[in-house]
Amino acid sequence: MTSLRKTHPLLKIANSALIDLPTPSNISAWWNFGSLLGLCLASQIVTGLFLAMHYTSDISTAFSSVTHICRDVNYGWLVRNMHANGASFFFICLYTHIGRGLYYGSYLYKETWTVGVILLLLTMMTAFVGYVLPWGQMSFWGATVITNLLSAIPYAGQTLVQWIWGGFSVDNATLTRFFAFHFLLPFVIAAFTAIHLLFLHETGSNNPTGLNSDADKIPFHPYFSLKDLLGFTILILTLTSVALLTPNLLGDPDNFTPANPLVTPPHIKPEWYFLFAYAILRSIPNKLGGVLALLASVLILATVPFLQTSKQQALTFRPLTQLVFWTLIANIAILTWIGGMPVEYPFVSIGQLASLAYFSIFLIIIPTTGWLEDKTLKWSRT
Protein backbone atom coordinates (compact mmCIF):
# COMPACT_ATOMS: atom_id res chain seq x y z
CA MET A 1 0.00 0.00 0.00
CA THR A 2 1.33 3.46 -0.94
CA SER A 3 2.11 5.71 2.01
CA LEU A 4 -0.43 8.48 2.78
CA ARG A 5 2.30 11.12 2.51
CA LYS A 6 2.76 10.16 -1.15
CA THR A 7 -0.94 10.25 -2.08
CA HIS A 8 -2.63 12.93 0.07
CA PRO A 9 -2.87 16.22 -1.95
CA LEU A 10 -1.34 18.37 0.83
CA LEU A 11 1.08 15.86 2.36
CA LYS A 12 2.36 15.06 -1.14
CA ILE A 13 3.69 18.64 -1.50
CA ALA A 14 5.39 18.52 1.93
CA ASN A 15 6.77 15.06 1.14
CA SER A 16 8.38 16.13 -2.14
CA ALA A 17 9.86 19.26 -0.50
CA LEU A 18 11.01 17.95 2.90
CA ILE A 19 11.10 14.14 3.02
CA ASP A 20 11.73 12.41 -0.32
CA LEU A 21 13.51 15.39 -1.89
CA PRO A 22 16.58 14.05 -3.80
CA THR A 23 19.55 15.92 -2.30
CA PRO A 24 23.25 15.83 -3.30
CA SER A 25 25.03 13.61 -0.76
CA ASN A 26 28.01 15.96 -0.40
CA ILE A 27 26.36 19.29 0.54
CA SER A 28 28.19 20.87 3.48
CA ALA A 29 27.06 22.91 6.49
CA TRP A 30 26.97 26.01 4.24
CA TRP A 31 23.70 24.57 2.86
CA ASN A 32 22.13 24.71 6.36
CA PHE A 33 21.48 28.45 6.20
CA GLY A 34 18.39 28.20 3.97
CA SER A 35 16.51 26.22 6.63
CA LEU A 36 17.96 28.48 9.36
CA LEU A 37 16.43 31.46 7.53
CA GLY A 38 13.08 29.66 7.63
CA LEU A 39 13.50 29.20 11.38
CA CYS A 40 14.44 32.88 11.81
CA LEU A 41 11.38 33.98 9.81
CA ALA A 42 9.05 31.77 11.87
CA SER A 43 10.63 33.02 15.12
CA GLN A 44 10.31 36.68 14.05
CA ILE A 45 6.65 36.25 13.05
CA VAL A 46 5.74 34.56 16.37
CA THR A 47 7.64 37.01 18.62
CA GLY A 48 6.44 39.94 16.49
CA LEU A 49 2.83 38.82 16.86
CA PHE A 50 3.13 38.80 20.66
CA LEU A 51 4.79 42.24 20.62
CA ALA A 52 2.03 43.61 18.36
CA MET A 53 -0.55 42.58 21.00
CA HIS A 54 0.90 45.16 23.41
CA TYR A 55 2.46 47.78 21.09
CA THR A 56 0.68 51.03 20.20
CA SER A 57 1.60 52.78 16.94
CA ASP A 58 1.09 56.33 18.20
CA ILE A 59 3.99 58.75 18.70
CA SER A 60 2.76 59.76 22.17
CA THR A 61 2.65 56.17 23.48
CA ALA A 62 4.92 54.03 21.21
CA PHE A 63 8.07 54.42 23.34
CA SER A 64 6.08 53.90 26.56
CA SER A 65 4.38 50.79 25.14
CA VAL A 66 7.80 49.21 24.45
CA THR A 67 8.84 50.07 28.03
CA HIS A 68 5.54 48.55 29.26
CA ILE A 69 6.26 45.34 27.29
CA CYS A 70 9.69 45.03 28.92
CA ARG A 71 8.56 45.89 32.47
CA ASP A 72 4.97 44.70 32.92
CA VAL A 73 4.14 42.00 30.36
CA ASN A 74 4.91 38.40 31.38
CA TYR A 75 8.27 37.58 29.75
CA GLY A 76 7.79 40.66 27.55
CA TRP A 77 11.48 41.54 27.99
CA LEU A 78 12.42 38.11 26.61
CA VAL A 79 10.04 38.35 23.63
CA ARG A 80 11.37 41.83 22.81
CA ASN A 81 15.03 40.79 23.16
CA MET A 82 14.46 37.67 21.04
CA HIS A 83 12.76 39.77 18.34
CA ALA A 84 15.37 42.56 18.29
CA ASN A 85 18.35 40.18 18.28
CA GLY A 86 16.50 37.74 16.02
CA ALA A 87 16.69 40.40 13.31
CA SER A 88 20.50 40.47 13.62
CA PHE A 89 20.70 36.68 13.42
CA PHE A 90 18.32 36.75 10.43
CA PHE A 91 20.79 38.99 8.58
CA ILE A 92 23.81 36.91 9.66
CA CYS A 93 22.12 33.84 8.13
CA LEU A 94 20.97 35.85 5.09
CA TYR A 95 24.43 37.23 4.27
CA THR A 96 26.03 33.81 4.82
CA HIS A 97 23.41 32.24 2.53
CA ILE A 98 24.19 34.83 -0.19
CA GLY A 99 27.94 34.33 0.32
CA ARG A 100 27.52 30.56 -0.13
CA GLY A 101 25.50 31.20 -3.30
CA LEU A 102 28.26 33.43 -4.68
CA TYR A 103 31.07 31.03 -3.74
CA TYR A 104 29.48 27.87 -5.11
CA GLY A 105 27.86 29.46 -8.19
CA SER A 106 24.25 28.88 -7.09
CA TYR A 107 23.40 32.15 -8.88
CA LEU A 108 23.40 30.21 -12.16
CA TYR A 109 19.92 29.00 -11.17
CA LYS A 110 18.67 32.37 -12.37
CA GLU A 111 15.01 32.19 -11.27
CA THR A 112 15.88 31.02 -7.75
CA TRP A 113 18.59 33.70 -7.47
CA THR A 114 16.33 36.53 -8.72
CA VAL A 115 13.59 35.61 -6.22
CA GLY A 116 16.37 35.52 -3.58
CA VAL A 117 17.41 39.10 -4.44
CA ILE A 118 13.74 40.18 -4.12
CA LEU A 119 13.63 38.42 -0.73
CA LEU A 120 16.75 40.33 0.37
CA LEU A 121 15.15 43.67 -0.61
CA LEU A 122 11.90 42.77 1.19
CA THR A 123 13.80 41.74 4.33
CA MET A 124 15.83 44.97 4.32
CA MET A 125 12.63 46.98 3.92
CA THR A 126 10.94 45.07 6.77
CA ALA A 127 13.94 45.60 9.07
CA PHE A 128 14.05 49.33 8.25
CA VAL A 129 10.37 49.99 9.04
CA GLY A 130 10.67 47.79 12.15
CA TYR A 131 13.60 49.84 13.48
CA VAL A 132 11.37 52.95 13.45
CA LEU A 133 8.66 51.42 15.68
CA PRO A 134 10.22 51.85 19.18
CA TRP A 135 10.25 55.62 18.43
CA GLY A 136 13.63 56.25 20.02
CA GLN A 137 16.08 58.91 18.83
CA MET A 138 17.80 56.70 16.26
CA SER A 139 14.41 55.34 15.10
CA PHE A 140 13.13 58.85 14.36
CA TRP A 141 16.29 60.26 12.80
CA GLY A 142 16.99 57.06 10.84
CA ALA A 143 13.49 57.26 9.35
CA THR A 144 13.95 60.96 8.56
CA VAL A 145 17.35 60.54 6.86
CA ILE A 146 16.57 57.39 4.86
CA THR A 147 13.12 58.47 3.63
CA ASN A 148 14.56 61.89 2.75
CA LEU A 149 16.90 60.17 0.27
CA LEU A 150 13.92 59.71 -2.05
CA SER A 151 13.80 63.49 -2.49
CA ALA A 152 16.86 63.03 -4.75
CA ILE A 153 14.56 61.54 -7.42
CA PRO A 154 14.18 64.26 -10.07
CA TYR A 155 10.83 66.07 -10.34
CA ALA A 156 8.71 63.65 -8.21
CA GLY A 157 11.11 63.27 -5.25
CA GLN A 158 9.72 65.80 -2.77
CA THR A 159 6.10 64.79 -3.46
CA LEU A 160 7.03 61.12 -3.00
CA VAL A 161 8.72 61.79 0.36
CA GLN A 162 5.70 63.71 1.69
CA TRP A 163 3.41 60.95 0.42
CA ILE A 164 5.43 58.33 2.37
CA TRP A 165 5.51 60.56 5.48
CA GLY A 166 1.78 61.29 5.27
CA GLY A 167 2.59 64.94 6.04
CA PHE A 168 5.44 67.44 5.99
CA SER A 169 7.67 65.52 8.41
CA VAL A 170 8.06 62.09 10.03
CA ASP A 171 5.06 62.07 12.35
CA ASN A 172 2.14 59.99 13.65
CA ALA A 173 0.93 59.01 10.16
CA THR A 174 4.44 57.74 9.31
CA LEU A 175 4.65 55.56 12.42
CA THR A 176 1.16 54.10 11.85
CA ARG A 177 1.87 53.12 8.24
CA PHE A 178 5.34 51.77 9.10
CA PHE A 179 3.72 49.51 11.71
CA ALA A 180 1.19 48.32 9.09
CA PHE A 181 4.03 47.54 6.64
CA HIS A 182 6.12 45.84 9.33
CA PHE A 183 3.19 43.58 10.20
CA LEU A 184 2.36 42.75 6.57
CA LEU A 185 5.80 42.28 4.95
CA PRO A 186 6.90 39.10 6.83
CA PHE A 187 3.91 37.29 5.30
CA VAL A 188 4.90 38.60 1.86
CA ILE A 189 8.43 37.27 2.59
CA ALA A 190 6.91 33.88 3.51
CA ALA A 191 5.03 33.81 0.18
CA PHE A 192 8.18 34.66 -1.79
CA THR A 193 10.06 31.98 0.19
CA ALA A 194 7.58 29.42 -1.15
CA ILE A 195 8.26 30.68 -4.72
CA HIS A 196 12.03 30.57 -3.99
CA LEU A 197 11.72 26.89 -2.94
CA LEU A 198 9.47 26.11 -5.91
CA PHE A 199 12.15 27.31 -8.34
CA LEU A 200 14.92 25.58 -6.35
CA HIS A 201 13.13 22.22 -6.52
CA GLU A 202 12.74 22.62 -10.29
CA THR A 203 16.52 22.38 -10.73
CA GLY A 204 17.60 20.68 -7.50
CA SER A 205 20.32 21.88 -5.14
CA ASN A 206 23.83 22.76 -6.18
CA ASN A 207 26.75 21.06 -4.37
CA PRO A 208 30.31 22.02 -3.26
CA THR A 209 31.97 20.64 -6.40
CA GLY A 210 29.70 22.56 -8.78
CA LEU A 211 29.33 19.35 -10.81
CA ASN A 212 26.16 17.45 -11.76
CA SER A 213 25.15 15.27 -8.81
CA ASP A 214 22.21 13.35 -10.35
CA ALA A 215 24.13 10.08 -10.01
CA ASP A 216 24.62 10.50 -6.25
CA LYS A 217 21.51 11.78 -4.47
CA ILE A 218 19.96 10.73 -1.16
CA PRO A 219 16.58 11.53 0.45
CA PHE A 220 16.43 14.76 2.45
CA HIS A 221 14.93 12.92 5.46
CA PRO A 222 16.49 11.61 7.69
CA TYR A 223 19.98 12.67 6.56
CA PHE A 224 19.64 16.42 6.09
CA SER A 225 16.63 16.93 8.36
CA LEU A 226 18.87 15.77 11.23
CA LYS A 227 21.75 17.88 9.97
CA ASP A 228 19.42 20.92 9.88
CA LEU A 229 18.28 20.09 13.41
CA LEU A 230 21.88 20.50 14.60
CA GLY A 231 21.97 23.93 12.91
CA PHE A 232 18.65 24.84 14.58
CA THR A 233 20.06 23.89 17.99
CA ILE A 234 23.21 26.00 17.53
CA LEU A 235 21.20 29.00 16.27
CA ILE A 236 18.61 28.83 19.08
CA LEU A 237 21.33 28.44 21.74
CA THR A 238 23.33 31.38 20.37
CA LEU A 239 20.26 33.61 19.96
CA THR A 240 18.92 32.88 23.46
CA SER A 241 22.41 33.42 24.94
CA VAL A 242 22.62 36.87 23.32
CA ALA A 243 19.00 37.72 24.25
CA LEU A 244 19.55 36.71 27.89
CA LEU A 245 23.14 37.82 28.54
CA THR A 246 23.93 40.78 26.25
CA PRO A 247 20.58 41.88 24.76
CA ASN A 248 21.77 45.40 23.88
CA LEU A 249 25.11 44.40 22.37
CA LEU A 250 24.02 45.06 18.77
CA GLY A 251 21.67 47.99 19.47
CA ASP A 252 22.28 51.74 19.57
CA PRO A 253 22.35 53.53 22.97
CA ASP A 254 20.58 56.54 21.37
CA ASN A 255 17.45 54.44 20.98
CA PHE A 256 16.97 54.39 24.76
CA THR A 257 16.07 58.09 24.50
CA PRO A 258 12.53 58.94 23.28
CA ALA A 259 12.41 60.56 19.82
CA ASN A 260 12.98 64.32 19.87
CA PRO A 261 12.73 66.21 16.55
CA LEU A 262 14.59 69.18 18.11
CA VAL A 263 17.76 67.26 19.07
CA THR A 264 19.87 65.56 16.39
CA PRO A 265 22.06 62.62 17.56
CA PRO A 266 25.82 63.22 16.99
CA HIS A 267 26.08 60.25 14.58
CA ILE A 268 23.02 59.04 12.71
CA LYS A 269 23.59 55.45 11.63
CA PRO A 270 21.44 52.40 10.87
CA GLU A 271 21.69 48.94 12.46
CA TRP A 272 24.99 47.08 11.84
CA TYR A 273 23.55 44.96 9.01
CA PHE A 274 22.96 48.06 6.83
CA LEU A 275 26.28 49.77 7.55
CA PHE A 276 28.05 48.47 4.41
CA ALA A 277 25.35 50.01 2.17
CA TYR A 278 25.29 53.19 4.31
CA ALA A 279 29.08 53.56 3.85
CA ILE A 280 28.63 53.28 0.05
CA LEU A 281 25.84 55.90 0.20
CA ARG A 282 28.06 58.31 2.16
CA SER A 283 31.11 57.79 -0.04
CA ILE A 284 29.52 59.78 -2.90
CA PRO A 285 29.23 63.54 -2.20
CA ASN A 286 26.26 63.95 -4.58
CA LYS A 287 22.81 63.08 -3.13
CA LEU A 288 21.34 61.41 -6.23
CA GLY A 289 24.65 59.63 -6.92
CA GLY A 290 24.70 58.32 -3.35
CA VAL A 291 21.13 56.99 -3.60
CA LEU A 292 21.91 55.25 -6.90
CA ALA A 293 25.08 53.72 -5.40
CA LEU A 294 23.06 52.54 -2.38
CA LEU A 295 20.55 50.81 -4.67
CA ALA A 296 23.34 49.41 -6.86
CA SER A 297 25.14 47.95 -3.81
CA VAL A 298 22.25 45.48 -3.37
CA LEU A 299 20.92 45.19 -6.94
CA ILE A 300 24.40 44.31 -8.23
CA LEU A 301 23.65 40.78 -6.96
CA ALA A 302 21.00 40.48 -9.70
CA THR A 303 23.70 41.04 -12.37
CA VAL A 304 26.02 38.28 -11.08
CA PRO A 305 24.50 35.43 -13.21
CA PHE A 306 25.12 37.49 -16.37
CA LEU A 307 28.76 38.23 -15.49
CA GLN A 308 29.83 34.56 -15.30
CA THR A 309 32.84 34.04 -17.57
CA SER A 310 34.23 30.78 -16.16
CA LYS A 311 33.24 27.34 -17.42
CA GLN A 312 33.29 26.10 -13.83
CA GLN A 313 30.27 26.77 -11.63
CA ALA A 314 31.82 26.78 -8.15
CA LEU A 315 35.02 28.42 -6.85
CA THR A 316 36.13 25.09 -5.31
CA PHE A 317 38.80 24.53 -7.98
CA ARG A 318 39.46 28.20 -8.85
CA PRO A 319 42.16 29.54 -6.47
CA LEU A 320 42.51 32.94 -8.18
CA THR A 321 38.81 33.80 -7.91
CA GLN A 322 38.76 32.37 -4.37
CA LEU A 323 41.33 35.01 -3.41
CA VAL A 324 39.16 37.73 -4.98
CA PHE A 325 36.04 36.38 -3.21
CA TRP A 326 37.67 36.56 0.23
CA THR A 327 38.98 40.04 -0.65
CA LEU A 328 35.34 41.00 -1.28
CA ILE A 329 34.33 39.64 2.15
CA ALA A 330 37.14 41.63 3.81
CA ASN A 331 36.08 44.69 1.81
CA ILE A 332 32.45 44.37 3.04
CA ALA A 333 33.79 44.11 6.62
CA ILE A 334 35.75 47.36 6.06
CA LEU A 335 32.62 49.06 4.64
CA THR A 336 30.64 47.91 7.71
CA TRP A 337 33.28 49.44 10.00
CA ILE A 338 33.38 52.70 7.99
CA GLY A 339 29.56 52.98 8.01
CA GLY A 340 29.63 53.27 11.80
CA MET A 341 32.39 55.91 11.85
CA PRO A 342 31.93 59.71 11.76
CA VAL A 343 32.14 61.54 8.40
CA GLU A 344 35.73 62.79 8.67
CA TYR A 345 39.24 62.04 7.43
CA PRO A 346 40.51 59.28 7.03
CA PHE A 347 37.17 57.40 7.17
CA VAL A 348 35.71 59.19 4.12
CA SER A 349 38.73 58.28 1.94
CA ILE A 350 38.78 54.66 3.15
CA GLY A 351 35.02 54.41 2.46
CA GLN A 352 35.44 55.76 -1.08
CA LEU A 353 38.26 53.32 -1.86
CA ALA A 354 36.31 50.39 -0.35
CA SER A 355 33.17 51.37 -2.34
CA LEU A 356 35.20 51.51 -5.56
CA ALA A 357 36.73 48.10 -4.74
CA TYR A 358 33.24 46.65 -3.98
CA PHE A 359 31.85 47.47 -7.43
CA SER A 360 35.14 46.69 -9.22
CA ILE A 361 35.30 43.18 -7.74
CA PHE A 362 31.76 42.35 -8.93
CA LEU A 363 31.85 44.03 -12.33
CA ILE A 364 35.49 43.73 -13.46
CA ILE A 365 37.81 41.58 -11.32
CA ILE A 366 35.72 38.37 -10.88
CA PRO A 367 34.75 38.16 -14.61
CA THR A 368 38.43 38.78 -15.51
CA THR A 369 39.81 36.09 -13.16
CA GLY A 370 37.17 33.62 -14.45
CA TRP A 371 38.29 34.25 -18.02
CA LEU A 372 41.97 34.07 -17.00
CA GLU A 373 41.53 30.72 -15.22
CA ASP A 374 39.85 29.24 -18.32
CA LYS A 375 42.74 30.54 -20.46
CA THR A 376 45.28 28.99 -18.08
CA LEU A 377 43.46 25.64 -18.28
CA LYS A 378 43.19 26.09 -22.07
CA TRP A 379 39.38 25.93 -21.83
CA SER A 380 37.27 27.93 -24.22
CA ARG A 381 33.60 28.69 -23.51
CA THR A 382 31.27 26.87 -25.91
Curated annotation (Swiss-Prot):
Its main location: mitochondrion. Gene3D superfamilies: Cytochrome Bc1 Complex, Chain C (1.20.810.10). InterPro entries: Cyt_b/b6_C (IPR005798), Cyt_b/b6_C_sf (IPR036150), Cyt_b/b6_N (IPR005797), Cytb/b6-like_sf (IPR027387), Cytochrome_b (IPR030689), Cytochrome_b_C_euk/bac (IPR048260), Cytochrome_b_N_euk/bac (IPR048259), Di-haem_cyt_TM (IPR016174). The chain crosses the membrane at residues 33-53, 77-98, 113-133, 178-198, 226-246, 288-308, 320-340, 347-367. It comes from the Eukaryota. It is found in: Mitochondrion inner membrane. Heme b b562 binds at H83, H182. One of its GO terms (molecular function) is metal ion binding. Binds 2 heme b groups non-covalently. Its cofactor is heme b. This is Cytochrome b. One of its GO terms (biological process) is mitochondrial electron transport, ubiquinol to cytochrome c. Pfam families: Cytochrom_B_C, Cytochrome_B. It is a multi-pass membrane protein. Keywords: Electron transport, Heme, Iron, Membrane, Metal-binding, Mitochondrion, Mitochondrion inner membrane, Respiratory chain, Transmembrane, Transmembrane helix, Transport, Ubiquinone. The cytochrome bc1 complex contains 3 respiratory subunits (MT-CYB, CYC1 and UQCRFS1), 2 core proteins (UQCRC1 and UQCRC2) and probably 6 low-molecular weight proteins. Component of the ubiquinol-cytochrome c reductase complex (complex III or cytochrome b-c1 complex) that is part of the mitochondrial respiratory chain. The b-c1 complex mediates electron transfer from ubiquinol to cytochrome c. Contributes to the generation of a proton gradient across the mitochondrial membrane that is then used for ATP synthesis. CDD domains: cytochrome_b_C, Cytochrome_b_N. Belongs to the cytochrome b family. Heme b b566 binds at H97, H196. One of its GO terms (cellular component) is respiratory chain complex III. A ubiquinone binds at H201.
